[in-house]
């Protein structure tokens, strides 16, 4: 993963200095070098448990549940869940001019630039390499075609899982999100009960309520307002639908329509991924 992060950083730096044409050449060259390095390390560091490396990406609109399902799968498969949203929030919590610039972007519902995301991700991959992590599940990256091309050039993504949910349910979920200011736990106070589309089954998503010790400490993220959420959804569709097409054309995209809440959706997602629920182990019930 150190090779991946170095190549990502090199590609980002090249993109800020040169034209798109020259950047593409440097991306390809860096990708070839990184691919060779990853291949060598892969032969030496095969996963002992089942011999398989997991290098997956989760796509989906803000609030769809990428973090929830990616986290459960990371526990089940014992690979790190790397959420770029968490990387951004950690950076926001660090004092200084960079966090102030980042806060202005996020609070206005804009997507963070490629360069910022790539640098944050690169740092996280380097830290993981130092700890001996094998594989990863990415959540929130890539969000643009350029990011997808950089990632494609430096590592093999096995699978891209595109979670889909009706927009009115997405809006309700985003507005219902809460976080415990003490433990950092994520919860949702929204209770969603909607008629099915085109005669389909009714959609019910119960709230994910906090334990008693967290109830008085719940806070709302500053970017979870109706105006900002709608803007984020619009920006997502403009930028990320081409990313879906990018992976669909390569035969790597699995589109999964969430039928309801976690109890209903989780076993069906495992079935779609050909994973045995009996191997779930530490994943939440």
UniProtKB/Swiss-Prot annotation:
Disulfide bonds: none
Transit peptide: 1-33
Region LID, residue ranges: 176-224
Family (UniProt): Belongs to the adenylate kinase family.
EC code(s) of this entry: 2.7.4.3
Name assigned to this protein: Probable adenylate kinase 6, chloroplastic
Summary of the function given for this chain in its UniProt record: Catalyzes the reversible transfer of the terminal phosphate group between ATP and AMP. Plays an important role in cellular energy homeostasis and in adenine nucleotide metabolism.
Chain residues that bind ATP: 63-68, 177, 186-187
UniProt-listed InterPro entries: Adenyl_kin_sub (IPR006259), Adenylat/UMP-CMP_kin (IPR000850), Adenylat_kinase_CS (IPR033690), P-loop_NTPase (IPR027417)
Region (NMP): 83-112
